C-alpha cells in the first residue's frame, strides 16, 4: 500500500465505527420490517420460501426431553405457546422418541393448531423414512408435520447429495 492510501489508526477506527453504526441501524430497520410482532410481542418471520410465519425463536425437543418431570415439560411448552412461540422442533432420535411423546401430549387439546411443527428423519431409504414418519406422527399425536427434514447427513453411508 502506498503512503497516499495509508490511513492512521484513528482514521481507520473512526471509519470502522461509523460503518458499524450504519450497518447496525440498517439491520434494525430490516429486522423490524421483516419481523412484525405477533399478538404477544414475539417477533415473527416468514420461514424461507414456505410463506409460513413462525416465531423467531424455536422450542427444541432435545431440551424438552431433558426435563425430568413430564408435567413441567408440558407446562413449559404451554407457557411458550401462550407467549407467542409458534415454532417447535423435534426428532425421533431425541431421548429415544421420548421428546416427541411428551411434545405430543403438550400439543393435544387444540395446542397443535397453534404451532408450526418440525421433526426430523434419520433414515436413508424410502421404507425406513416412511416408518420413521409414521412413528413420529403417532408419538406427536398429529396427522401432519409442517416441516420434515433429514437429520445429520454426516455418516459414511449417507447418499451423496
Model-derived regions: residue spans:
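N-terminal secretory signal peptides and thylakoid transit peptides that target proteins
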Residues: 2-20
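C-terminal segment of N-terminal export signals and the immediately downstream linker at the start
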Residues: 27-57
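Conserved, mostly hydrophobic/aromatic
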Residues: 47, 59, 88, 103, ...
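Acidic (Asp/Glu)-rich catalytic clusters
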Residues: 48-51, 104-112, 136-142
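Short, well-ordered coil/turn segments that N-cap beta-strands
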Residues: 52-56, 85-86, 111-115, 142-146
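Active-site mouth loops of central-metabolism enzymes
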Residues: 60-70, 119-127
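Glycine-rich, proline-tolerant flexible connector loops at the mouths of alpha/beta enzymes
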Residues: 90-106
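Glycine/proline-rich, positively charged
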Residues: 124-161
Amino acid at each position: 500500500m502506498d503512503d497516499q492510501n495509508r490511513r492512521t489508526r484513528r482514521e481507520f477506527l473512526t471509519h470502522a465505527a461509523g460503518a458499524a453504526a450504519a450497518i447496525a441501524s440498517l439491520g434494525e430497520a430490516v429486522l423490524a420490517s421483516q419481523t412484525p410482532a405477533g399478538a404477544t410481542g414475539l417477533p415473527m418471520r416468514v420461514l424461507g420460501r414456505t410463506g409460513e410465519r413462525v416465531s423467531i425463536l424455536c422450542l427444541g425437543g432435545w431440551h424438552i426431553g431433558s426435563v425430568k418431570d413430564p408435567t413441567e415439560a408440558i407446562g413449559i411448552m404451554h407457557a411458550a405457546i401462550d407467549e407467542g412461540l409458534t415454532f417447535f422442533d423435534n426428532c425421533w432420535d431425541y431421548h429415544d422418541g421420548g421428546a416427541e411423546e411428551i411434545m405430543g401430549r403438550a400439543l393435544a387439546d387444540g395446542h397443535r393448531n397453534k404451532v408450526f411443527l418440525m421433526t426430523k428423519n434419520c433414515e436413508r431409504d424410502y421404507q425406513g423414512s416412511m416408518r420413521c414418519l409414521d412413528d413420529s406422527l403417532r408419538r406427536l399425536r398429529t396427522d401432519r408435520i409442517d416441516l420434515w427434514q433429514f437429520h445429520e447427513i454426516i455418516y459414511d453411508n449417507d447418499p451423496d447429495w
